[in-house]
């Protein structure tokens, strides 16, 4: 193992740097540095050689040119035992450790007020060059791009004076992952800007990078391998930010279903709400005066399907609700923004139940993209975050205030049901859910069947449809079940026929002007 004798340190994020640099100084490592990093180290009593003194060439062009010099890159790229003679001939001392992180380009362009000039000035040139050079020559050079690695590198240096081959290789791979992401972010930004000026909504090339959070026993089915990857900077509370408090390891299906349940319940903030999901579809959703009441009412919609389901809440999980769940049913996952200590103790009686806490979320989620893999390609779209374009009554009868509240409730639920989606509801509780049918009228039939099977009365309820009714048969079916009001996007060639059917049955019907297909 080759000892670390000389290090180059130049960082934008100085988290943890002083402690790491002190370890190097204590081992007698010579430290080369630039600009603000050099000042920080010197101000804290560490001996530093400015890169400009090392190269005999000043920093220039407002810091654009600092480390781009043969005496720096030769010291990094020189192969020990192979290039020693040429390094000696040209007076190039070897550099054994490179510690660099980059200008914060992604954080800069995330600011809506960022202009092109500011973005350009936050494109790091020297940093990626140093990192890539050191990573390429990892056989001789240790490279650190992540402050989280300072501790393990410091421990190896303190114990042996150098860094093991396995660690150097891992750190080198990490560098290329990091620079790939960095260059991808720049390419995405500039390409999107160029395409926007040309009238396009998306960049002509799209570079994405996710970090592996978890390797899984298997995927959707036991014969499929799987892993869970997350964004580097998750902007909003969700399944990717969740902390598992107890329970078995989350499976592929657990994560997919928990995401569906949580994203659905996040729509509701005006009262305690509960969403129960099975196979990515809500099988019960309800409001309540308390969290326990919300759970009880959601469970009533479809107790049979709730078995082995995922339960999500929009309020802190309390002990009373937690006790009710574990005493009543088998549940795979419970997730809430927060979980009280008493609720944790209650769920602990069922050690296999996966209990998650995701943190509070914003009532105004930021824009994001949705992706769907197809063979040989990727479908990209804006996430479906809006609810309605407008609410317009199209029938002779206007919905009552109570009906309108239920219509808007079921409309929010229908948005998360697989198409064709029909949701029956009353008093802000789902009565029946018809999901994933090829025929919309069959979804309506299934919603009525589910309600009857659960012992719930459809008469006097309302209905939401995620897309327009192509024929009047869906309205006739709903009327036969006792539905009194309907919410749907409208836009069918036969809207007049559908409206006439609603009028014949004395129904109120509103159009939203916005479809919510979910595939």
Curated annotation (Swiss-Prot):
One of its GO terms (molecular function) is IMP cyclohydrolase activity. Its EC number is 2.1.2.3, 3.5.4.10. Pfam families: AICARFT_IMPCHas, MGS. CDD domains: IMPCH. PROSITE patterns: MGS. InterPro entries: AICAR_Tfase_dup_dom_sf (IPR024051), Cytidine_deaminase-like (IPR016193), MGS-like_dom (IPR011607), MGS-like_dom_sf (IPR036914), PurH-like (IPR002695). Keywords: Hydrolase, Multifunctional enzyme, Purine biosynthesis, Transferase. GO terms for biological process: 'de novo' IMP biosynthetic process. The keyword Hydrolase applies. Pathway: Purine metabolism; IMP biosynthesis via de novo pathway; 5-formamido-1-(5-phospho-D-ribosyl)imidazole-4-carboxamide from 5-amino-1-(5-phospho-D-ribosyl)imidazole-4-carboxamide (10-formyl THF route): step 1/1; Purine metabolism; IMP biosynthesis via de novo pathway; IMP from 5-formamido-1-(5-phospho-D-ribosyl)imidazole-4-carboxamide: step 1/1. Belongs to the PurH family. This is Bifunctional purine biosynthesis protein PurH. It comes from Allochromatium vinosum (strain ATCC 17899 / DSM 180 / NBRC 103801 / NCIMB 10441 / D). The lineage of its organism: Bacteria, Pseudomonadati, Pseudomonadota, Gammaproteobacteria, Chromatiales.
